[in-house]
């Protein structure tokens, strides 16, 4: 039986170049799903594109490290009322308010439904903040309550000594398709390593994008274009199939655990 491979494009809604890049990688390449930032500047454009491509599975990319939150979130915003990368320090200091985080997650979930007209296919987060030991239990509980699959980094689970109760997830998640030196072999190596671990399902994160003025302001810009080129390489699908994988998405997971 073939192994399931989810290649998920994060950051849907970040800017129009990102949105168009994800659509290109989905229709012309091997991206099999995406996750949307409902607080991002181009989210309405992303929702419009999703309406034009209803076969694209769209999940929620929970945001706690950039932009404006939907709720006051006083435990996390800076003096300008913005989210930033201070979440890691605040998590270590124990100053995060779980109820505030839960309310923000619920608000982003409801905004997703308003924008896309349906529930997300699954949940993950920007900068993987849901894997912080102070946040994982509450995000996992929310996903279970709503019967939504969840991106779970088993390495982070082991490193923090966390317990996993949610069964709707891939056996393995890999975030290493990222950086300045990406090649097609980089991606294929991740498949080979997951196979050696005996995983029957694997999720790989990616960020394929074109480049526009907004994207040029990102600290991770040019590599997104490289990702797009790799993920739309016509030689890639047979190499994936040769390794016993087929492209999948979280719509295939059962609706309850």
Regions found by a protein language model. Give the residues of each.
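Surface-exposed loop and adjacent secondary-structure segments within mature catalytic domains
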Residues: 63
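Terminal accessory/targeting
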Residues: 2-6, 16-59, 67-116, 122, ...
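DG-centered beta-turn motif at the end of beta-strands
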Residues: 9-12
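Active-site histidine-anchored catalytic micro-motif
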Residues: 127
